[in-house]
Amino acid sequence: MINIIDDLRPWVPEEVESFIQQHAERYQSMSFDELESKAFSLIEAHEKLMDQQSIVLYAGTNVINPKAAKMLSSSIGNRASLGYPGAKYNKGMEHADQLEILLMSLMRQLFQAKYVEYRVPSGSIANLYAYMATTKPGDKIMSFSDAAAGHVTHHAEGAAGLYGLEIHEVPFDFAQMDVDPEALMIAAKKVRPKLIIIAGSMCLFPYSLQ
């Protein structure tokens, strides 16, 4: 058995590594059956905390639509589906073909979009795709700071920084939890960014931009 307790990683922050090692030591001594039982109990505890005892204001982790949950739990989500509709490498995916075409049609209508890319594995990769489509490394962008609930993929530590973008903050009125439109106009004229991102991980009210 690999002893993860001794497998220290120098690239991980010390306080994070300490937290992991503290709990890993406890799990290391458990049997497979005990680990399985613990996994289910942790899921139950999470659902109780987040679904019953909390009000979640982050839409990305809020209660999922029951219809969407049913679709996600279907076995079609476990199948490899490589290639475009009508030209799949994997057999038995003719229904997935139709679902993908249906989804493209739905998204075009919903967002009035000419093109739809639905195959991204996460929001972080989707944001990276957006950067690649609208900017190039070295370009300037403006985005919400961490204090204004800006997403990590809009920052130097995330996709924007890893892609090589120069990041500037969108002026924000913290008392109103809103964008400062006048200050943004002044800053944008000075910075001249290729892209301005008006989006936060927490949005209590519509942003004041007309």
Regions found by a protein language model. Name each.
Residues 5-87:
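N-terminal "arm"/small-domain region of PLP-dependent enzymes with the aminotransferase-like
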Residues 62-63, 121-125, 148-149, 199-205:
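Gly/Ser/Thr-rich loops at beta-strand to alpha-helix junctions
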Residues 135-151:
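Conserved PLP-anchoring active-site segment centered on the Schiff-base-forming lysine
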Residues 80-125:
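Conserved N-terminal alpha-helix of the aminotransferase class I/II PLP-enzyme fold
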Residues 116-120, 143-144, 197-198:
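General beta-strand structural signal in soluble alpha/beta enzymes
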Residues 53, 110-114, 189-197:
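Short, surface-exposed connector motifs at secondary-structure boundaries
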Residues 153-198, 203-208:
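PLP-dependent aminotransferase-class I/II
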